[in-house]
């Protein structure tokens, strides 16, 4: 590899916006490395990072409120380009001598059209339409109450709307730019081109961050880190651990041992599929532990969702610890930690979020496990992990499957988990997913699954009355899984799935469809 793929980089300072990670993903998609830090980072950390440019992201606070977040002063003296987005533009304006006024119910939320004024590097050769006066018009997405009322000295207006005098501003000499809208969201039609102008033309970055270069870099770093030692990996068959396995195989070959723990809470035939793909097809060395009885025994009588998650996590760690001790030469433990995990566990450098559900795979490994940690995905977002998985030869169908919770069916069987319930649920879920594929809807929705409800309902089969279990179909559409709407599937499809489940699975008498959005509901039931 000729160039260091981390050498040219952008720093994004987060002020709490729900879109901040989206900015980082857009910059990565352009082909440039970036990191996401909290707004209150130390000046020395920025100096050490030495970014080619800095982006000040949005946030829910008001610049006019006492004690609201501010960018470190060094941002404006570092001599690198700066782009302020929404709150980022407002705090930049205020900190450099402009002023911001509190919105009095007249903010802009949703679609807006801005008119470009004059020539700016940020909007160069970009337009969605042309005004009668010849100026470019751009379709953008606004989300602000406060607004800049006076811009700092040296700045000019480069775009406005009918109600927002300073929709975008620039100090071209210092290469400081501010936009009141969100270029990172898809509703801003030319947003990707604006970010590309900033990162490549204004900051001067090259596109070194590609799937092939990421793989090459990860393999080289793991070879240097691991040397001739052996590595152990908990392989679940999910996206992250699967991609880690393929990267490690490329880096160290048969010095990798995978431990696959079948907890009895997987999807239909999933355990066999994992062994067939990674053991037989890719030739990985896998220890297959069938622990269904052990997991179900430990969960017997437990109906609290959080307690179930903790039991599943604890038993997995116990089994993994037992197996790792048998591998006397293993000096390293590999994990599928990805960048959003790093951001969250930093507590995060990006604010304080309430723990809604515990994640069984974050932390929790024994303190006495004397192994080094190998985390080749810790810089990557999920979409990047999937792309390098494709490059490594993993099948599209596996990489782009809908999300499956770490505790598996343990949180899709409501209440106490029993083998009978899991077996019924597995078959019902397989029918639902099969029919979505047949209808060419599987990849058009974001997540679909079946939930087992611990209630019986009266049904009629032929001339006989039956009293059997109820399941719920759940199908949602979302961009970021932070919010979601229930999928408006065709009634005929829902009816067909229901008929198949009731007729083909002895033990289920009723099928319902969940029409709850997020919020107020969560996507998973537990």
Swiss-Prot record:
Entry keyword annotation includes tRNA processing: no
Domain annotation Glutamine amidotransferase type-1: ranges: 9-208
CDD domains given in the database record: GATase1_GMP_Synthase, GMP_synthase_C
Reactions catalysed according to its record: XMP + L-glutamine + ATP + H2O = GMP + L-glutamate + AMP + diphosphate + 2 H(+)
Keyword set includes ATP-binding: yes
Pathway listed: Purine metabolism; GMP biosynthesis; GMP from XMP (L-Gln route): step 1/1
Domain GMPS ATP-PPase: 209-401
InterPro entries per the UniProt record, alphabetical: Class_I_gatase-like (IPR029062), GATASE (IPR017926), GMP_synth_C (IPR001674), GMP_synth_GATase (IPR004739), GMP_synthase (IPR022955), GMPS_ATP_PPase_dom (IPR025777), NAD/GMP_synthase (IPR022310), Rossmann-like_a/b/a_fold (IPR014729)
Keywords: ATP-binding, Glutamine amidotransferase, GMP biosynthesis, Ligase, Nucleotide-binding, Purine biosynthesis
Pfam family, one: NAD_synthase
Function: Catalyzes the synthesis of GMP from XMP.
Subunit structure: Homodimer.
Positions contributing to ATP binding: 236-242
Enzyme Commission numbers on file: 6.3.5.2
One example GO MF annotation: ATP binding
Organism name: Psychromonas ingrahamii (strain DSM 17664 / CCUG 51855 / 37)
Name of the featured protein: GMP synthase [glutamine-hydrolyzing]
């Amino acid at each position: 590899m000729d160039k260091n793929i981390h050498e040219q980089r952008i720093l994004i300072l987060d002020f709490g916006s729900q879109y901040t990670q989206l900015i980082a993903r857009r910059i990565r998609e352009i082909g440039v490395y970036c990191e996401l830090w909290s707004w209150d980072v130390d000046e020395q950390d920025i100096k050490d990072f030495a970014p080619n440019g800095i982006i000040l992201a949005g946030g829910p606070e008001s610049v006019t409120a006492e004690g609201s977040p501010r960018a470190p002063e060094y941002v404006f003296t570092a001599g690198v380009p700066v782009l302020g987005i929404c709150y980022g533009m407002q705090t930049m304006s205020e900190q450099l001598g402009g002023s911001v006024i509190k919105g009095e119910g007249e903010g802009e939320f949703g679609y807006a059209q801005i008119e470009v004024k004059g020539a700016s590097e940020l909007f160069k050769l970009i337009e969605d339409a042309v005004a009668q006066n010849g100026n470019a018009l751009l379709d953008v997405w606004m989300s602000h109450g406060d607004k800049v009322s006076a811009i700092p000295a040296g700045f000019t207006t480069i775009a406005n709307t009918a109600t927002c005098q300073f929709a975008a501003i620039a100090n071209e000499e210092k290469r400081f730019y501010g936009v009141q809208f969100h270029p990172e969201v898809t509703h801003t039609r030319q947003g990707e081109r604006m970010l590309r102008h900033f990162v490549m033309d204004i900051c001067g970055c090259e596109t070194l961050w590609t799937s092939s270069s990421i793989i090459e870099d990860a393999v080289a770093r793991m070879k240097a880190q691991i040397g001739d030692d052996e590595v152990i990996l908990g392989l679940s068959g999910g996206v992250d651990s699967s991609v880690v396995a393929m990267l490690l195989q490329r880096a160290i070959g048969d010095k990798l041992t995978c431990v696959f723990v079948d907890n009895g809470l997987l999807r239909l035939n999933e355990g066999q599929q994992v062994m067939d793909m990674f053991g037989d097809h890719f030739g990985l060395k896998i220890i297959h532990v069938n622990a269904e009885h052990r997991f179900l025994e430990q969960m017997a009588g437990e109906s609290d969702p959080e307690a179930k998650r903790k039991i599943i996590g604890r038993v997995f760690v116990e089994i993994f610890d037992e197996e790792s001790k048998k591998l006397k030469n293993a000096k390293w433990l590999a994990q599928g930690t990805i960048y959003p995990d790093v951001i969250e566990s930093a507590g995060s450098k990006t604010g304080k979020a309430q723990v809604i559900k515990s994640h069984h795979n974050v932390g929790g490994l024994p303190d006495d496990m004397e192994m080094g940690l190998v985390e080749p995905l810790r810089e990557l977002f999920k979409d990047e992990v999937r792309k390098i998985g494709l490059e490594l030869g993993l099948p599209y169908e596996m990489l782009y499957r809908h999300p499956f919770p770490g505790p598996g069916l343990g949180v899709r069987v409501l209440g106490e988990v029993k083998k009978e319930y899991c077996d019924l649920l597995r078959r019902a879920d397989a029918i639902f997913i099969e029919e979505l594929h047949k209808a060419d809807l599987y990849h058009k929705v974001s997540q679909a699954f079946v939930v087992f409800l611990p209630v019986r309902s009266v049904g009629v089969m032929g001339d006989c009355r039956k009293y059997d279990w109820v399941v719920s179909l759940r199908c949602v559409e979302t961009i970021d899984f932070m919010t979601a709407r229930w999928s408006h599937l065709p009634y005929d499809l829902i009816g067909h799935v229901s008929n198949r489940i009731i007729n083909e699975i002895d033990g289920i008498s009723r099928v319902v469809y969940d029409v709850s959005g997020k919020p107020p509901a969560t996507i998973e039931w537990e």
